[in-house]
């Protein structure tokens, strides 16, 4: 476009700015003042002469025309792209309808007492409140930091439901394969599914208007790790849940929010519309359970920390010395506990000696050094060896982004292509081609962001 002041150029910049804010920063909307400011920066970046630059008035005038013609949606002082506004508006409407739909409160006292005896558990007042609330409303939320007994509450809810409805159907879901497997293991239920699998979705926002919606056939749906759910996935979830299905959303509001746009869990908690039970008593009280306490202190803004067997602070003057000490600690712990039970976390991927990529290479040379060319494969500037600890970085049908495993073998097929055998636990023993290794990283060390929702017995952070 030759005319740098044309309405078409300004329109394109406005829409680009909104999409950039969504995809890079997770914003569903921008305040009008911010949108004008960011759009001007984009429009005027290639114009060095101040007198020739686009003025704020021009952007504001074009914005008004875009709002009039539906190219941008204005809600109060906030501006949305029509697609994103539709997602939020649709989700809010479905939640409001669910809350307005009077759910029959069930008397659970007899069932709850029976469950206490069968599971051999004693529930705190807050835990009992969470269980009761789940059977009094169509939509409820349970939150709490690590160690506050969320899993015990889920077990109790499931058992009370089975006691009340022997032929009833319930479904457990979580955003990732890793979280769903952990949910099934911790509750003792045969199956928990990913949201995408349970809802019949792909891995992205490719659901068309005419595509058939698969409804979830369940009387009770429990979703764990709901803080990871973005606005698009929340819309797809509520679209597929029947109005008479009880829904329990569970999560830690202090965990990192969803990668996609929209902080749905936080907004639901603070809306004042959804019944919320906050579990705030830490039950892990052993001398080896200090991490849960320290996480609570940090969330509360306290500088107090407990130190002991499972929480140690090691002072180090430089990154080089830090990297050396991390390697020494890792090798000692891995020798005692096994590599699968030790994990290094770093806030950086590439920057500095203590970044995860540098630590991965250094650690690997100590715990899994070169043996023979037959036992390693080079992909670009990366090398993988038999016995390497690895992490999957992209969701597939069998493994999820963040899943950890080991390389168990490297072979060559009849065409001379190198194939890598991976073991991610259970029946997930897979063979990778060189192309598929693009979505695999060494995982002796990883970034704190990548590690969100993973577990290891020992962590060097």
Q: What are these model-predicted stretches?
A:
Residues 121-133:
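N-terminal pre-P-loop "Q-motif" helix
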Residues 452, 456-459:
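Conserved small/polar residues in nucleotide/adenosyl-binding loops
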Residues 146:
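The conserved Walker
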Residues 1-107:
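Accessory, non-ATPase domains that flank or precede helicase/AAA+ motor cores in DNA-metabolism machines
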Residues 136-140:
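Pre-Walker A (Motif I) flank of P-loop NTPase domains
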Residues 133, 250-398, 408-410:
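Conserved helicase motor core of P-loop NTPases
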Residues 141, 152, 156, 160, ...:
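Conserved helicase motor core of SF1/SF2 NTP-dependent helicases
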């Amino acid at each position: 476009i030759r005319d740098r002041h044309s309405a078409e150029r300004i329109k394109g910049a406005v829409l680009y700015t909104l999409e950039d804010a969504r995809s890079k920063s997770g914003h569903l909307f921008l305040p009008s003042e911010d949108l004008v400011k960011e759009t001007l920066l984009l429009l005027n970046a290639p114009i060095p002469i101040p007198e020739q630059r686009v003025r704020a008035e021009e952007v504001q005038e074009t914005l008004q025309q875009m709002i009039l013609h539906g190219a941008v949606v204005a809600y109060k002082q906030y501006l949305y792209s029509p697609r994103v506004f539709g997602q939020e508006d649709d989700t809010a409407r479905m939640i409001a309808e669910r809350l307005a739909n009077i759910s029959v409160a069930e008397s659970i006292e007899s069932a709850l007492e029976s469950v206490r005896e069968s599971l051999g558990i004693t529930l705190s007042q807050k835990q009992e409140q969470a269980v009761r609330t789940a059977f009094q409303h169509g939509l409820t939320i349970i939150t709490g930091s690590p160690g506050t007994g969320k899993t015990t509450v889920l077990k109790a809810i499931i058992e009370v439901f089975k006691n009340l409805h022997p032929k009833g159907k319930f479904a457990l879901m979580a955003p990732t394969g890793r979280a769903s497997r952990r949910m099934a293991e911790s509750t003792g239920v045969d199956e928990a599914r990913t949201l995408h699998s349970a809802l019949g979705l792909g891995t992205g926002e490719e659901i068309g208007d005419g595509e058939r919606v698969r409804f979830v056939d369940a009387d009770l749906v429990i979703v764990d790790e709901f803080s990871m759910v973005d606005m698009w996935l929340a819309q797809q979830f509520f679209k597929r849940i029947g109005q008479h299905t009880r829904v329990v959303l569970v999560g830690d509001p202090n965990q990192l929010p969803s990668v996609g746009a929209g902080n749905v869990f936080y907004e639901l908690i603070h809306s004042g519309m959804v019944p919320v039970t906050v579990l705030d008593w830490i039950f892990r009280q052993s001398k080896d359970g200090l991490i849960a306490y320290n996480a609570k202190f940090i969330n509360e803004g306290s500088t107090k920390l407990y130190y002991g067997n499972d929480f140690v602070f090691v002072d180090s003057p430089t990154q080089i010395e830090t990297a050396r000490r991390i390697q020494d600690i890792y090798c000692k712990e891995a020798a005692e506990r096994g590599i699968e039970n030790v994990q290094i976390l770093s806030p950086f991927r590439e920057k500095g000696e203590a970044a995860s990529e540098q630590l991965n290479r250094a650690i690997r040379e100590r715990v899994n050094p070169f043996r023979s060319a037959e036992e390693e494969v080079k992909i670009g500037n990366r090398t993988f060896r038999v016995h390497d600890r690895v992490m999957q970085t992209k969701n597939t049908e069998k493994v999820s982004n963040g899943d950890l495993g080991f390389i168990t073998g490297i072979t060559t097929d009849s065409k001379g292509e190198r194939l890598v055998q991976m073991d991610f636990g259970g029946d997930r023993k897979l063979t990778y081609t060189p192309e598929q290794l693009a979505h695999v990283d060494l995982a002796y060390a990883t970034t704190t962001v990548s590690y969100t929702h993973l577990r290891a017995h020992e962590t060097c952070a």
